[in-house]
C-alpha cells in the first residue's frame, strides 16, 4: 500500500511484501507511469518506507519497488501501483516564530469550526500535513483519535489516520461534538442530546441585549430553548 486510494496526507507510508533473498529494496515514485520524473528514488533494508518531504497536495503518484540482492544486482519491479493525494482543506494559518530554537520537533493536531468543520495536522511552520472532514475532540496517549466521523451522520466514535471507522455509536445516536472518550475498561462514553425545553434567561450583563430582542430576560419566564444532555456509556462489543 497505498494502492488505488486518495490519501488525506502528504506524509506517505509505503508497504510491500518481502522478496526472497533480498537484502535491500529500491523504491521509486513518480508523477508519470513512465517514471521519467521521480519524486523519490531511494534504497531501504525494510519493507516499509515513510516519505515526509517529496509529496504535496493534489499530487498523482505512481510507485514501484524492486529487490536488491547481496551481489548488488536488481530484481524485477514489483507491480506498479497508483494513488492520489487530496486537497488542502484547513483554513490558512499565520504562524509567528519568535525563536526557532525553542520549538520542539513534532506535529500539532486541531479541529477548526469555521468556515467549515475540519480537523488536521500541521508542522511547526503551519504547513498542512493531514486532514479530515471529521470533528475530532480527543486524542489519547496512544494517538487514537475520537470524535464525530464525517460519514456517520453525527454519530461519534473512534477513527484512524486512514479515515477508517474503528467504532461508532449505534444508529440514531448522535453525540454532542465536544467530547467522546474511551474508558480504561474499553467502553466508550459521550454526551448525547436528551431533551430541549423552554427555560428562563438568567439575569446578568447580557440581560439588556436579550431584552432588546424582545425577551423578558427576568430569570423567571420560560422563554428560551435549553438543551439537556445525557451522559451515556456504551459497551465496546455490544454497543
Annotated model-derived regions:
Residues 19-23, 113-116:
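Short proline/glycine-enriched turn/loop motifs at strand-loop junctions of beta-rich domains
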Residues 68-71, 76-239:
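Histidine-/acidic-rich catalytic cores in large beta-rich domains
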Residues 1, 14-16, 27, 51:
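Residue-level signature of extracellular beta-strand-rich folds
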Residues 10-21:
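Conserved aromatic anchor
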Residues 24-60, 68-81:
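Recognizes extended acidic, P/S/T-rich segments that occur
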Residues 4-9:
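Short, solvent-exposed loop/linker segments at the N-terminal edge
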Residues 19, 53-57, 183:
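Hydrophobic loop/turn residues within beta-sheet-rich immunoglobulin-like superfamily modules
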